[in-house]
UniProtKB/Swiss-Prot annotation:
Pfam families: DNA_pol_A_exo1, HRDC. This is Ribonuclease D. Its cofactor is a divalent metal cation. SMART domains: 35EXOc (SM00474). Its EC number is 3.1.13.5. Keywords: Cytoplasm, Exonuclease, Hydrolase, Nuclease, tRNA processing.
């Protein structure tokens, strides 16, 4: 067990880690009862050292850690980095970089969609991780030796996984495929949670400009309230209540209280008054200034095309050993079915080369799908036409 509890010890270990080409990083945190995640433990490892940092230790200053996270000479290796990076951003307004996310890399290398750390350790390192501390309350002190050992294991095996994935990416020429994902993960915009943008999580739940205006205001109010009180959004209002408010747009306390999902008694509280004020602001918005609502791509006769694109995506994913989610999602397929020039990742960069071009060819009948020996295969238009035109063998009369 190697547990860091003082600023001096943290500075010393970070200085040693900074001399290495990469460090593996993980965090343990709690967020079940708060809006902002509460950092409890940070795990760090280099090629020859692994430690856990007690982020809740009295008097501990995490500045040396944040300096290491910002060091451009050291690659920071995480698995499923997004929540870890969010915590660092919230605390220090920096994002660890350069960054390597082994979950993303594993998806490019054919290990499946969003493979867990435990499964990756099992597959790559042939080790089954101890899961006895999986549901630990990491805010409780003192930390037991078994808990610290469990936490450190999350960065020790990550070293071997990083090396193996790096080699595989270089061998296949796919190292550059990670650049878009890493750029997204290292963008501050990914972690900024501004109340004005809270409505975007529900953008497909309303269809009328008036409803959108109300949704933008009430979602923004909830976001600001949850942040200010540091409680989960659902503690303020559940998601379905926001949609009900947007669609019904009640304009009085009585009307608010009559909504089926609205919390009883809140309609005549301070929060109720603020919600009614938010609804009025939403109704007063000029429809011309509202974001454009995307029409439902699942309508308009594109359903069959989307289903074919799903088959094509699965075929390409399996044949190239790349997780389907890394190539395209259902929203991308719906967009491509509706518009050849859709602004989706699947029609840009390596994704376009691997999938997008063929998706458009399939959509316009220049590519066909068939089954050979139980597997879906692609046929170019000319090849498919020749097969269709090939005369059937004459039947031989019996007898």
């Amino acid at each position: 067990m190697s547990l860091i509890t003082t600023t001096e010890a943290l500075a010393e270990v970070c200085q040693r880690l900074a001399s290495h080409a990469f460090v593996t990083v993980d965090t343990e945190f709690l967020r079940e009862t708060t809006f902002w995640p509460k950092l409890c433990v940070v795990q760090l490892a280099s090629a020859d050292e692994a430690v856990a940092v007690d982020a809740l230790a009295s008097g501990l200053d995490l500045a040396p850690l944040f300096e290491l996270m910002a060091d451009p000479a050291v690659v920071k290796v995480f698995h499923a980095a997004r929540q870890d990076l969010e915590i660092v951003w919230n605390l220090a307004k920096i994002i660890p970089a350069p960054l390597f996310d082994t979950q993303v890399a594993a998806m490019v290398c054919g290990f499946g969609d969003q493979v867990s750390y435990g499964d990756l350790v099992q597959t790559v390192c042939k080790v089954s991780l101890d899961k006895s501390s999986r549901f630990t309350d990491w805010s409780r002190r003192p930390l037991l030796p078994a808990q610290v050992d469990y936490a450190i294991a999350d960065v020790t095996y990550l070293r071997d996984i990083y090396a193996i994935l790096q080699d595989k990416l270089k061998e296949t020429g796919r190292l550059g495929w990670l650049s878009d994902e890493m750029a997204l993960l290292t963008s501050p915009a990914t972690y900024e949670q501004h109340p004005d943008n809270a409505w975007e999580r529900f953008r497909n739940r309303v269809r009328k400009p008036r409803d959108l205006g109300v949704l933008m205001e009430v979602a923004g109010w909830r976001e600001a309230e949850a942040q200010a009180r540091d409680v989960p959004r659902s503690r303020i209002l559940k998601d379905d209540v926001l949609i009900e408010l947007a669609l019904a747009a009640p304009r009085s306390a009585d009307a608010l209280g009559n909504l089926r999902a609205f919390p009883r008694g809140m309609e005549r509280s301070r929060a109720g008054a603020e919600i009614l004020a938010a609804i009025e602001r939403g109704l007063a918005r000029d429809p011309k200034t509202l974001p454009k609502l995307e029409r439902d791509r699942r309508t308009g006769g594109n359903g069959a095309t989307v289903e074919l694109l799903k088959v094509l995506l699965r075929q390409i994913s399996e044949s190239h050993g790349v997780a389907a989610k890394m190539i395209a999602n259902v929203e991308d397929l719906e967009a491509i079915a509706a518009d050849d020039n859709a602004k989706v990742a699947a029609l840009t960069g390596w994704r376009r080369e691997l999938f997008g071009v063929k998706a458009l060819e399939l959509k316009h009948g220049r590519l066909a799908l068939t089954v050979e020996r139980g597997r879906v295969v692609m046929l170019e238009w000319q090849e498919a036409s020749q097969e269709a035109e090939e005369p059937a063998a004459p039947e031989t009369a019996a007898g």
